[in-house]
């Protein structure tokens, strides 16, 4: 084994351990915050947020906005730049302490109910410390690039216990590579990270979804609605980029973020599904039990409210992921379109439409169809039974995003 190969092997092991510890720390910090804020000692955030009073929802979210605003204001006082994971993969320095500050603030506000995802935090921390390890080991520029990307992917895998998704995310989004030199570290780091963060046994799925059954109705739905879901996911990605570029990084943060979180809290006082990173909203759409009662109007209300609170949080100065919000919005679109479809052509449950919507929308919003589909499968521990309609929907969504991207150039 050459010197470079030995160094890459050592970096792979170190990165898996780093990402696993980062994921473990983020999990425990989030659970501790949610226990304090929402009396959440088990179950889901939706159940916990629904159980507390509407006034408490408003107060907790407003507190989250105030704490987040102060933390980010202090972080940006001397340096307003934030190094993204993609930039770090390409070689831009990512100071570990600054990345940790930024990441822990994200975990804090998400724990207090912020309407953004928590997945960016472990990706940033793991990437930053993996880059430091790569520099310490003297890796070549290309091997360093691989290791930083693996750190980010393994961090994602560790915090959600999704080893396959973490590896595919690394290869499809960050490295855009299928070379053996990249594939082996991507899978090894994700596996090691999940082993450290959650152990040998898999925890309960992130979303509780009933067993999904295939049907001709669902297959035709996937084939026809896929392009629409893709266009919506593409539009979501463009809108997030525009809104994110406009968020304040100066004293205005101290005003805009608490005000935005207050608005989110007021919405949550009536609709607790908007609380948190999107799990509650998506779970509402996956639950088939409400379909016979509230039906289409309620599904549309949850979809609209989650869209509003996510964009409001980002525009006001909040930082965080959009992966789980995208799952929530995709599931909502699938449910909203699927309910009237099921009335006209019975044979499929709401959860199946929501699953297809989430996979197609997420893949389009990330410009990563493989990652999007595998993420939703691992998040729900469902999907193999309806792979044909899901793949048709993802394929149609990918075709739509490709066409829209070319037109936008």
Place the predicted regions along the sequence by residue.
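Alpha-helical transmembrane segments and immediately membrane-proximal extracytoplasmic
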Residues: 1-409
